């Protein structure tokens, strides 16, 4: 019997379109003899849709047309089953959902919000837990956790938007303790959205003003001179995990921007056979693998994640830039370099999810009995004690 895997993507996020690219790629790589893929698209108003045509990226050229031929749906619990249900007066059942694979990026789908909803329903889902997903979305919390656990990160300062608006001078003075050039980043966005490299205070102020409409928390980091950028993926859970090959990012600008990632498509230049070439010493590459696993475990990640590194080759140092708990395309290109097909990657993620769910189900979820059955008795005893004290007076 095939498992029905609900693939949820889209969402109210600035990375909406990136999510569609990832999801349509992955949905067409499942073993259809073992799994039935159920596409669940969430539009920018957070309305859920189902339709077989949602598996093809070609249809998304006209979103209005996509939604016209799709059904509005909800994911609900009926007894011990999870049902994808058509919205409307009659609420027709579309199918049972055995497992969910979230493939959204950014707010709501990657930051623990969707994971929290699925967790509350009790639906098994691929990937990191609510807490790990939330940490993975917040660059500030990540860095503070990494620092505490002796994982190297670049020097940084962070602040809330209202702090800059109320006392700009204090915030700038604090930032100016760092060494220029600096990166200004919204704390909770991915895909290099809203990131600027600045060389002086004038550029810094402008970059902060550009970042504030995107996030309530801003992080400013020191840059690495003559930087090399590299990615590595980790798959598994906190008990057991393994690393992919390492990819050096080829960039034509000062940093790996949104335009290079998705518009010009430079990330597609590295074919699997070109990945894992010796970009630094063997010792530094081994350090990267160890730090990647440590970062994965520190936040409590599960499934597959991608860890991005900054390399100072001259001084023989590596820094963890960030961890992504739902990497684009599930970082499958990094695993293909290790002779693992996209279908095999999906199969491994489903096995990890089943294992995680079994462990979760084995833990105590609630206490037997009902304390409220004794409420009147307990209340009566308290009242009696109060009366006894009053009588003693």
Question: For the regions a protein language model found, what residue spans apply to each?
Answer:
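A short glycine-rich, hydrophobically flanked beta-strand micro-motif that places a catalytic Asp/Glu
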Residues: 38, 218-222, 230, 302-314
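ATP-binding N-terminal substructure of ATP-dependent carboxylate-amine bond-forming enzymes
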Residues: 1-131, 135-137, 141, 160-168, ...
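Residue-level detector of anion-binding/catalytic polar loops
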Residues: 36, 124, 152, 217, ...
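Short acidic-glycine loop/turn motifs at beta-strand connectors
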Residues: 43-46, 236-239, 312-315
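ATP-dependent carboxylate activation and anion-phosphoryl transfer catalytic cores
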Residues: 3, 9, 279-393
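Active-site nucleotide/adenylate-binding loops and adjacent lid/helix of ATP-dependent enzymes
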Residues: 2-8, 13-24, 90-94, 133-226
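Phosphate-binding site of ATP-dependent enzymes
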Residues: 196-275, 279, 283, 317-318
